[in-house]
Amino acid sequence: MIVSGLAKGIDARAHLNADKTIGVLGCGINVIYPKENAYLYERMKKSGLILSEYPMHVKPLAYHFPWRNRLIAALSDNLVVIEATYKSGTMITVNECLELSVPIYCVPTAFQNVKYQGCNYLINNGANILVDINDVDDI
C-alpha cells in the first residue's frame, strides 16, 4: 500500500506504480492539485482512495502541507524516502514518523547531490538503508 501526497515527481510515480494507493490532499477533496496530476486524481477516484481533512473547495495553502504530511505519517506502516533536501516537506513527514515510531528507509546517494542530502543525513542518524528496489516489497 502506498500512502503519499499526490504531489508531482516521486509521489506521482509511486501512486501510478502501486496496486493499492492512498492520496492525502492538502486542499479540499474536490480540488485537483497540482493540476498536472489530474489524470492521476481521476484514476485514484476509481481505483484508489483520496483523503482530505479540508472542506470542499478549500484551495491548497502552504501551511496545509505539513498537516497533510502528519496524516501521511499516521497512515503509514513504513516511510520510504527516495530524495529529500534538508528543508523539504519530506523531512516534515520524517519527523512525524519519528514521533509515531514509524520505521524509515532511505536511498543513499553521492555526497554532492543536494536533492538527496537529507537521505544521507537520515541514514547517518539511524534510518534504514534501502539499496535494492526489490527490497521494498519486503518492508
Where would I find each of the regions flagged by the language model?
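Glycine-biased, small-residue-rich flexible motifs in mid-sequence functional cores and linkers
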Residues: 1-139
